[in-house]
Amino acid sequence: MIPPCDPSPHHRSDDRVFQKSALRLNVSPYFDGFIRKISSRVRLAEEHVEAVKRLSLEGPVIYALKNKSRLNRLLIREAARRGNIPVPFWSMGEDASFADLPASVNGTQPPNGEEAASILARRESAVLQLGSSGLVHDPAVEEALIGLIHLQRHLPDPVYIVPVLISYGRRRDLQDENLFNILFGQFDDVGPVRRMIALLRYANKLAVIPAQALNLKAYLAEHERLSQDELLWQLRGELIGRIDEEREATVGPILKSRHEFIERILQDVSFIGYLKALEEREKKPLPVLLKESRRYLHEIASDYSETFIELWEKLLTWLWKNIYDGVIVDRKGLAGIREISRQMPLVVVPCHRSHIDYLLLSYVFYKENIQLPFVAAGINLSFWPVGYIFRKSGAFFIRRSFKGLELYGEVFSRYIKAMMAEKMPIEFFIEGGRSRTGKMVMPKYGLLSMILRAYQEEGMKNLGIIPVYIGYDRVIEEKSYIQELEGMPKRGERTSDVIKNRKVIRKRYGQVYVNIGEPIIFKDYMEKRGLVLDAMEDRERQALYRKISYEIALSINRVSVVTPSALVAAAFLTQDRREIRHDRWKAVLDTFRTYLASRRVPFAATFQEADKAVSGALDIFLREQMITVDDAGRAPSGQGETIYTLPGEKRLLIDYYKNMIIHYFLPLSFLSLSVLSRKEDSLPLGVILEDYVFLKKLFRHEFIFDEEKNDEDEIREELVYLADRGHIDFEDGKAPQTVTVRGNGEEALDAFAGLMRSYLESYWLVTRSVSLAGKEEREEKEWMKEIRRLGLQFHKDGELRRYESLSQQNFQGAIRFLADTGLVSLTEKEARKFYRLSGAPASLDEIRRRIFRFLH
């Protein structure tokens, strides 16, 4: 709900005043009542309301409409009333022979110059009708603009002209329209009957969207040298242009049909040249290569249908109400996306946590009147009927690997280039696949590189890259994720899986969160670094693509939401014991929450009532038996002796939610591990820094670090935090730089260190497995099974204390680290990977001992 403005002479919020002075048209009371009822559904975004209110405090507001329409004027009047923003008093730019009869000061005629000046001085509002095109001479509009310019030159305050788009729906314009849409689906520059039909057809999707306001006083000062005719032509064109930009930002560019899109690629001269060169190399006839290319394009290409979008809108609205408790969106960030989409093509790059992600952003953009992106989906989702539905909803499909598929790679690259040439917004997941662990997966930049190459080859002026965080209190795939982490092979998606998953509707999964990261405006990004794509060698471009992909991932991490379930999970997994007392768990949780608050990270809105939010998450953990409390361990209310039990097999699931926020703790966790691993009373800063660098290197395939930050500066910042809380003695800048643990500081450090110990156990286990295997070559899948069998035995014997350390993903990260250091080598035979010890066993033992030291 938008709070009303304070009543003032300049902005009247009393409905009786609005009724008296607002624009009234010569329509019947019945029609007026109908419009009022219809307009109750009109969406006027809160940020737009606030923007207009701010303008009205500085000067009078004039609403500018592109097409002359009595209906649109009524809609803007009602939207203004409902939003409690200035309501239009009269209308300008009417054709004399068809003018409505507004209730002006006299009650019958539009105000004369003196009356209009008086009205504007009181900061009353009006509607300015611009006509359909700035290229067409329109005496009535020009007369209205001349009058408005004259009034502005005699007013001390600026007059703000707010161009307004009246959107009757989100239907994209198609290059080849069907007859029904030509007759009944259009609403720009049409007569009253067809406009009314459009209103009835899209009544639930009406939106009033103000574009960027024009300060008329500043505009006249900037263009004072223009003649009157030039000024009128330019001003009218500017206002119409802003409405057109807003429309494209809302619905996107005009779409070609799928058939035309495919044929355009196949008939491209440069693509034919590529195929002829391939014909020479591979000795395949050109018609065969063309046939293969067409087959690939039919596999890849989307087949957008507005009907499916409208169906999804209804289905997803039901989903958010019945399975989730709503979607919490970053409205300021979305407003930024809208602003960028007015100026340049968009690439939206979210993280990937659930199959629902494919639909979520499109749903949010649809509701917020932002053009819908075309989403890159994995080929595993192309099975019927899901693939058909996704394709009709704007998805295009990509294979997991292009290896050995030169023609497919070229065709896919051409498809991306064609989309970029049409300024179609693209959405793809920077991690490639869904994260099975809850944390950000290392970014994949293959698709990003194709997009940036298309940007370069098409000579585009600019490109907006938008990182987006998507998070869930709980994901519906959690069970299958844990099975994969435990070593069960991933099954391909099937229609039967969708049917079986109907049982998810019997559960509640909390809230969904959408936060917008810092956009990368590519032209500005390159200029700031003095880089020019055309001047870069291929190796330099690859390094650039990789760097940008990591910056996208970092940006997503910075806006990831601390949810109650993530904080509850983190507090449970700091220790390796099966049981934990409520008081100890709550103390750890409060320690973590205090630290996160000091770092000003985003918290879920439910933390406004923190105790209630935590209790709610705890209840879910108990209800889902992720933790248990037996009768003997349940204390009477208020005694604080309740004991929670963590079943070993459930720790992997709890670990998933802990990992959602673990990146916020990395510097402090590494520091705590270093301090606790040493027996000295006073530890030199240099020793801590050495351990910190080692741990960053060890986990370079697990976590995304900001390489632009100085390691020592990060450590000092965390030491100052611990010292301020009384956990350690440390005086920054005072020699010698040493750290001494104070009082109960060891307990706090142990909590932070505990967040990383499952990863350390995983890596230690892999080094043990390599040592036991010696120089023997191991096939990857079989080796992973052996590591898990060994880990289960060590866990049973007590050598491994955390069941969550038996994670396939962690094993893979450890293997990549050992390959980086040259301790294991990788060979590929017939698309299978084989590993063997290739470094000195003593070097491997040294790493294993160093990891072990952090565990004890």
Per-region residue spans from a language model:
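Membrane-interfacial terminal anchoring regions of lipid-handling membrane enzymes
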Residues: 1-856
